[in-house]
């Protein structure tokens, strides 16, 4: 995951769930937290989050709380995706609506994810 603000990569992270034995160590959460720390604010409303996989419910909750400007993701996640696949957490459920673009280089992202998790598990 990468957080970009003003055309500059502010932070980047990858999934550390297995490495840390921590279910909350998703790439999105780690990248958002690092960006907030670097910028000195919990409001990232001028930043865009780029991720390989459509964010899950936990990550979408954090994305909304950080007030990220938009999410761009590669592969749709029909099992747990909460931008559009399983539910749209930021659409009408709160006063925070996060625009998203999905399916960017989807096959390439899906292949990256398959290889990553094959090596981790």
Show where each model-derived region lies.
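Short secondary-structure boundary/capping segments
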Residues: 1, 40-41, 90-92
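Residues embedded in well-ordered beta-strands within globular domains across many folds
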Residues: 2, 48-50, 72
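Zinc-dependent deaminase
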Residues: 55-121
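A short, polar/charged loop-to-alpha-helix boundary motif
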Residues: 16-30, 34
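Immediate flanking context of iron-sulfur cluster ligation sites
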Residues: 41-53
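Short beta-strand scaffold segments in enzyme catalytic cores
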Residues: 1-7
């Amino acid at each position: 995951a990468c957080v970009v603000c003003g055309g500059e990569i502010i932070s980047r992270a990858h999934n550390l769930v297995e490495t840390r034995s921590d279910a909350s160590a998703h790439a999105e959460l780690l990248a958002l937290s690092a960006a907030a720390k670097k910028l000195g604010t919990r409001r990232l409303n001028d930043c865009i989050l780029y991720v390989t996989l459509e964010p899950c419910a936990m990550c979408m909750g954090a994305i909304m709380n950080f007030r990220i400007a938009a999410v761009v993701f590669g592969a749709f996640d029909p099992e747990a995706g909460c931008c559009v696949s399983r539910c749209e957490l930021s659409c009408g459920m709160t006063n925070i609506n996060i625009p998203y673009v999905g399916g960017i280089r989807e096959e390439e992202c899906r292949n990256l994810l398959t290889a990553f998790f094959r090596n981790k598990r």
